[in-house]
Amino acid sequence: EYTVKVEAEGYEPVEVTGSELLSGEQSVQQVDLKLAEGAAFADVTIPDHTLFGEYPAKIPESEIKPTRESGEIVLSRVVIPEYIIVHDGAPTDSTARDYYVRYRDYIKNVACSEIYATWPDTAIRANILAIMSFTLNRVYTEWYRNKGYDFTITSSTAYDQKWIYNKTIYKNISRIVDEQFANYLS
């Protein structure tokens, strides 16, 4: 893990702690710069990767979800959205921030948070397909909206997949997501 400090004239400096680099893999660290109002650093801390960090276990869900007759929304077909809303915490955490994230960028982020870029190409492809399928299930069933929430998915491993704000993105994972963009398991 590395710390990245970014300074540019006319912008507030930013420090990103926890940026990951893997041997033999190219990565891109996104940094959001704000127009300068003061000189203080904006600190961003990227938590541990899910393969070695401590995160809550997935809460089991029934594979077949019962539908209610009370007007529950389920889309008529699978739609690959342009954006999704990621709730950065547990569904009931009203203090957690919501992020509007391009669907493609969300998939790249989750893949980089949950698998290693050094894995064999076929393993990366299989995991990305599973990540996209799980995400599209949440979109298609309007899972959280039907529970009264205003977001698409959470960043909590207890409920969904790990999404990390400003996560380091690996070039090979990014390329594979772009290649598999419209695929999913049904």
Show the residue positions of the predicted features.
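Conserved, single-site charged/polar hotspot
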Residues: 1-186
